[in-house]
Regions:
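Rossmann-like NAD(P)H-binding beta-loop-alpha module
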Residues: 123-135, 151
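Hydrophobic beta-strand scaffold residues
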Residues: 28, 46, 84-85, 110-113
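Structural motif
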Residues: 6, 64-65, 87-88, 114-115, ...
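C-terminal substrate-binding/catalytic lobe of Rossmann-fold NAD(P)-dependent oxidoreductases
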Residues: 6, 11-55, 136-256
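Rossmann-fold NAD(P) dinucleotide-binding segment
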Residues: 53-56, 60, 64, 68-87, ...
Length: 256
């Protein structure tokens, strides 16, 4: 499988390049990042534009760019019949609706979008979804490095959405006076509060807190190194050609 990486100069993108180059079933043929054009990523010279994918005859593009760039790159990939695996944060429901249109599953290119490629994080979201019907209150706290531009994270939003879909019985926030604006975080799906922390020294962490009378449950996942995302990325790259249309999340790949 011939693979190109978009956002190849970033922390995640450079790690993905190394993972693609190291896998015996994959071939890194293109690396794209306008901010690092001319540099080297896992033995490949970084190009400045997405057209490098066509020149290298890439079959799959892995997207780890800012959301603004990802939108245009995904349109290009759909038009040029390149499968896409997307780890970009900041894509909303409107973006997913457009991706369903761009990748309709009619024999053309396919697309997998995952809010998180760490297997532990996927399990955390699944466990939170399973626990949701048994609790009346819940909050999500996500913590990331201080270079992350978007807040809250896509993982936090997806977690709240899955919990809200699993249970509609969430108690209303009792806070009537917020002394410091934003102290109670933002409201995710179902009114579930989502809090974002940006701190130097972190990679990524998320904790889901659920409570009911007399008990609480905490579900937490910590990322200590970006290599933990690579098995999920590799899994998605190898699977995307056989997953018609748009697939959201790794659950379908892991659990069927």
């Amino acid at each position: 499988m011939r693979v190109g990486v978009l956002g190849a100069g970033g922390r995640m993108g450079s790690e993905v390049c190394r993972a693609m180059a190291a896998d015996p079933d994959l071939e890194l043929v293109a690396a794209v990042d306008p901010h690092y054009a001319g540099a080297e990523a896992a033995g490949v010279v970084v190009a400045g534009t997405v057209e490098a994918l066509a020149e290298a005859r890439a079959q799959v593009a892995v997207h780890f760019t800012l959301a603004e760039a990802a939108r245009d790159n995904l349109r290009w990939c759909a038009a040029h019949r390149v499968h896409s695996v997307v780890g970009t944060s900041g894509l909303g429901e409107g973006d997913l609706a457009e991706l369903r249109s761009l990748f309709p599953g009619d024999g053309g290119p396919n697309c997998i979008v995952a809010p998180n490629f760490a297997i532990g994080a996927v399990l955390m979201m699944r466990f939170a979804e399973m626990a949701a019907p048994f609790f009346e209150t819940a909050e999500v706290i996500e913590l990331h490095h201080d270079s992350k531009a978007d807040a809250p994270s896509g993982t936090a939003l997806a977690t709240a959405e899955r919990m809200a879909a699993a249970s509609a019985a969430w108690a209303a926030d009792p806070t009537t006076s917020e002394v410091v604006t934003g102290a109670r975080g933002g409201a995710g799906a179902g009114g579930i509060k989502v809090h974002s922390v940006r701190l130097r020294g972190l990679v990524a962490c998320q904790e889901v807190l659920l409570g009911t009378t007399g008990q609480t449950l905490s579900i937490r996942h910590d990322t200590t190194d970006r290599t933990c995302f690579m098995p999920g990325v590799v899994l998605a790259v190898k699977a995307v050609a056989d997953r018609p249309g748009l697939t959201v999340g790794l659950d379908a790949l892991l659990f069927g």
